[in-house]
Curated annotation (Swiss-Prot):
This is Aspartic protease 1. GO terms for molecular function: aspartic-type endopeptidase activity. InterPro entries: Aspartic_peptidase_A1 (IPR001461), Aspartic_peptidase_AS (IPR001969), Aspartic_peptidase_N (IPR012848), Pepsin-like_dom (IPR034164), PEPTIDASE_A1 (IPR033121), Peptidase_aspartic_dom_sf (IPR021109). GO terms for cellular component: cytoplasm; external side of apical plasma membrane; extracellular region; lysosome. The gene is asp-1. Disruption phenotype: RNAi-mediated knockdown partially prevents neuronal degeneration in a mec-4(u231), deg-1(u38) or gsa-1(Q227L) gain-of-function mutant background. Its main location: cytoplasm. The active site is at D86, D278.
Length: 396
């Protein structure tokens, strides 16, 4: 995978607006299905998840499909890394150069060789005695904490605390990533690490304490493509409509807020639920009853071999909208966003929805990239709110 250049638009001397292009990866799910390896992969994931049932409060991350990457550097001189830009977690971590496992190196058939961080080659790295361990939905990583100079998009944090991973779950070995940069709230951070965004705000490096995510759309998600733009310090007025609907956050852990109502076809639900916006989750997560309603309204069929709900690809543009009511406004998601061509064969496409279970103490919904591609998300840290504006896509 080729790296890409970060574009920095510097404003005043004391603060800035920074626009960082993202890159959308090839879908791991589509790749494994195409190579006939998906069934074995599912079995390994089920075994891993069975061991994670008692992990408690952890970030929501799903790296099975298209997700969005950015370039950073760490250390002096700078060492590059390509990381997931993830609003569903709050820690930054990269891979230790001393880790020699296949997961740390990248599996040969992943088509990507990991960029690792060599602490011995940075004159500004400070190793801490504290260890770190993070359990994500798709696997874990652990190692030790340290501090060094972080740069992303022309923004610099002089002493950013981050994880240096000495062990990665196998799933990360299949992905073209070198780490994760969490954009969630400090309360979600493991080991009370201060996230990069909070450090930037404290150092008054941004025009405004917010960032905007615009994700581009490609009907064929099996291949990696340019993925969108993150604007730090301002609202993206080029790729997002001018009208922004804001809603106060109901918790400052995830980017969590209330969902007033949901409808699809002839089905509607007015029970209020808690939902999170998460760039690290590819699809839409919903309660069991909602997933069942979507399946019924779209006439989807469950494919046991892939554990996916499928419909005919010919219906990609004609299935009913998924209509979310947030802050008193309706946000319809077109079927072209939630019916995905994963090259399953037989003219079948997948529904980009998954079950969150039947409820509990946490959020009941995840609005992942399927929703964010249709609506720019404005993550307003300063005012404790999130905003939504219609995304502009050329040629679609």
């Amino acid at each position: 995978m080729q790296t890409f250049v970060l574009l920095a638009l510097v404003a005043a001397c004391s603060a800035a607006v920074i626009q960082v292009p993202t890159h959308k990866t090839e879908s791991l799910r589509a790749k494994l299905i195409k190579e006939g390896k998906y069934t074995a992969f599912l079995a390994s994931q089920h075994a891993a998840r069975a061991q994670q049932l008692n992990t408690g409060f952890q970030p929501f991350v799903d790296y099975f499909d298209d997700f969005y990457l950015g370039n950073i550097t760490l250390g002096t001189p700078p060492q590059p890394a390509t990381v997931v830009l993830d609003t569903g977690s709050s820690n930054l971590w990269v891979i230790d150069a001393a880790c020699k496992t296949q997961a740390c190196n990248g599996y040969p058939d992943s088509g990507y060789t990991k960029q690792k961080f060599d602490t011995t080659k940075s004159t500004t790295f400070v190793k801490e005695t504290r260890k770190f361990s993070i359990q994500y939905g798709s696997g874990s990583c652990n190692g030790y904490l340290g501090k060094d100079v972080l740069n992303f998009g022309g923004l610099t944090v002089q002493s950013q605390e981050f994880g240096v991973s000495t062990h990665l779950a196998d799933v990360f070995g299949y992905q073209p990533v070198d780490g994760i940069l969490g954009l969630g709230w400090p309360a979600l951070a493991v080991d009370q690490v201060v996230p990069p965004m909070q450090n930037l705000i404290a150092q008054k490096q941004l025009d405004a304490p917010l960032f905007t995510v615009w994700l581009d759309r490609n009907l064929q998600i099996a291949q990696g493509t340019p993925g969108g733009l993150i604007t730090y310090g301002a609202i993206d007025t080029v790729n997002c409509a001018k009208q922004v609907t804001y809603v106060p956050l109901s918790a400052k852990t995830y980017w969590q807020f209330p969902l007033d109502a949901f409808a699809v076809g002839t089905y509607s639900e007015t029970k209020k639920d808690q939902v999170i916006s998460d760039t690290g989750t590819s699809w839409l997560g919903a309660p069991n009853t909602i997933v069942s309603a979507i399946v019924k309204q779209t006439k989807a069929v469950f494919d046991w071999s892939t554990e996916l709900y499928t419909v005919d690809c010919s219906t990609m543009k004609t299935q009913p909208d998924l209509i979310f009511t947030i802050g008193g406004a309706q946000f319809p998601v077109k079927s072209v966003e939630y019916v995905l061509d994963l090259q399953l064969g037989g003219g079948k496409c997948a529904l980009a929805v998954f079950s969150m279970g039947s409820g509990g103490f946490g959020p009941s919904w995840i609005l992942g990239d399927t929703f964010i591609r249709q609506y720019c998300n404005v993550y307003d840290i300063g005012n404790g709110q999130i905003g939504f504006a219609t995304a502009v896509h050329k040629g679609l």
